[in-house]
Design a protein with these regions (language model features):
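Short, exposed beta-strand-loop hairpins at the edges of beta-sheets
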Residues: 140-146
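Basic, often amphipathic N-terminal segments
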Residues: 1-61, 66-69, 84-139, 152-161
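Short, low-order "capping/linker" segments at domain edges
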Residues: 71-83
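Residue-level signal for glycine
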Residues: 148-150
Length: 161
């Protein structure tokens, strides 16, 4: 079983890149889940199709908040622009794909109707309130069991509309 995360980085990111500490600034599209390794190739293909269907993704910074089990992780909530609830709809579609491939969601209480699109602050940076950006990529990231390093397993380019 692989421990995976789906994000959209605000900073350039490449397949194969390894992060020993934290990830760069990113939107968490799906928090950690486990997936049987034998499902991975088909899973990656289906995620790619979903990402293409929801592309492009445009966001704007909203209010600050704190997430995590102790409410001590500073985040910037975000709003999807353009087609409305695009990030929430993409999140729901990816959840269906995760479930179809026997995925196990680490914190189901933060999923589906409880999903709050956000950017976790990295070195004091996220988006400013009302700041707009287009997301350029969606990434599949694996947390390695022994070291807890995170490796970028796949990167999907988003349409630039």
């Amino acid at each position: 079983m692989s421990e995976l995360l789906i994000t959209s980085s605000l900073d350039p990111i490449e397949k194969g890149q390894v992060f020993s500490k934290g990830l760069p600034r990113h939107v968490t599209i799906w928090q950690y889940f486990q997936l049987p390794d034998f499902h991975r190739d088909v899973f990656i293909a289906e995620v790619g199709e979903a990402v293409e269907a929801f592309s492009p993704l445009e966001i704007m910074g909203a209010e600050c908040d704190h997430f995590g089990p102790n409410n001590d992780v500073p985040v910037r909530r975000i709003m999807a622009l353009g087609s409305g609830a695009t990030l929430i709809a993409l999140h729901a579609t990816l959840g269906e794909i995760i479930n179809r491939h026997d995925g196990v969601i680490a914190n189901p209480e933060w999923a589906y109707q409880n999903y709050n699109p956000h950017i976790t602050y990295v070195e004091g940076q996220a988006l400013e309130e009302a700041e707009y950006t287009k997301l350029r990529t969606v990434e599949l990231i694996e947390r390695l069991p022994a070291s807890k390093d995170k490796i970028v397993r796949n990167v999907w380019e988003l349409e630039d509309a």
